[in-house]
Amino acid sequence: MSTVFPPEASSDKMNNIFDSHAHYDSEAFDEDRDSLVASLPDKGICGVINCASDIATSHTSLELAQKYPFIYAACGVHPHEAQEAAGNWLDELKLLCRNDKCVAIGEIGLDYHYDFSPREQQKEFFGRQLALAKELDLPVVVHDREAHEDTLELLRR
């Protein structure tokens, strides 16, 4: 079954909010995630893209997207997590991104503020994920913090 994206908005103006960047997979929502997410349409939310930060949260984002028809997933490895990614992460990401409920690759990019992962590694991961997005014809959700020139350079390639 093919996913309709974006969802059709209601004629009621209160139901036309599309949250393009959320993290409902965060442990901050563990206590009441289901009740909170289930209540979103009643609060005027017609759609949500839940952005992942690593392979594990890519799986979780897709689980949320499968459970709720108005949630979609962006799967990817955030620059903070590049150092922690291991093995065949790109192959696994590619499989996840082929899911009908995955509508983007993200949250990906560069973060030179904290440097939780070495900058060269961040650039490598960002470049590989941009190439995957091109291969799969998916848009990207970009994280850019204090790395504007390098981010633009990689996006222009």
Give residue ranges: language-model regions.
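Mid-domain alpha/beta scaffold segments of enzyme catalytic cores
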Residues: 2-157
